[in-house]
Amino acid sequence: LECIVEVNTNICNNVNEVRKDLKNKIAEVQEIANKNDNEIISIGTHPFARWKDQSVTNTNRYLDFLEKMQWPVRRLIISGLHVHVGVESGEKAISITNGMTRYIPLLIGLSANSPFFDSELTGLASTRTKIFEGLPTAGLPPLLKNYSEFQKFMRTLKRAGTIDSIREVWWDIRPHPSFGTVEIRVCDAVPTIEEMVNIAAFIQCLVVGFSENYDEGRQLEILDPWVILENKWRATRFGLDAEIIIDESGKLQPLKECILETIDKLLPVAESLGCRNELENLCYIVNMKKSPYIRQISAFNKNNQLTDIVKYFIDELKVHNTVHYD
């Protein structure tokens, strides 16, 4: 949609480079927006903008999507945070993609930032997740045995006319052969640059941890698809207050506890990557209940005004502001 701006970083070696890149580019976007009497926010769904009033970007690609899919595309007034992490081979990318699926609810819980849609409090922490699942090639990735099976699947989708390229496969996590990466796409857009960097660090640590296990021949733990799907729903609905299933017997664990345990296990990896502080920032957000969707609802509750959410998030994204998640 024309109301959405996509900001891409360059290839970065570490999260400090990501932070610097984002600050520079978002500052540039803000400057251009301000010159045209506009402001920008980073949010999963705009709290009151009407999707019926938005214009689709006038390019052949997006107009083709609209013609092909109709209503599911027209209501895509949503924004996400996508993170690419480089991996050495297609086989490793498939293994990591399979292993990462169990962490989808953690990523939703940490990033959930869309409790309002079309002026309505939806009852979901991440409304964006359910809207995006309306696309025919979105949602959980299938569990694939190897890279050859992935290639065969892509060829089949092309031959059937379902897609023209991998760019039209909108799984929550996907191998990206053109970039040599695993791309994590499940997160809502989060309000601040620091939160973007924190989540990118968490994702990088997960992927690097899986990569090391793969290199050492250790079997990656994979949950049954029904468990992953149920956990995704629980995080979408309840955010950090969700209880998720941790094994096939139905044993439950609070999502917040699972996130903190996962971060603790990843600290050695974070130390080696130079991003321990970023993971500790996530612990603070979890412990203090400062997740973005909670901040949205708090901003609204002060005066019952949806415009207060937008004003608050405009300020949060200002590059030179220090955000205290209050």
What is each of the regions a protein language model found here?
Residues 83:
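An acidic/histidine-cluster motif and surrounding catalytic segment
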Residues 92, 108-132, 139:
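Glycine-rich, mobile lid/loop segments that gate access to catalytic sites or pores
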Residues 59-80, 143:
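Acidic, His- and aromatic-enriched active-site or binding-groove loops in soluble protein domains
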Residues 22, 59-68, 87-108, 191-204:
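Helical (often loop-to-helix) elements that flank the catalytic cores of nucleotide-handling enzymes
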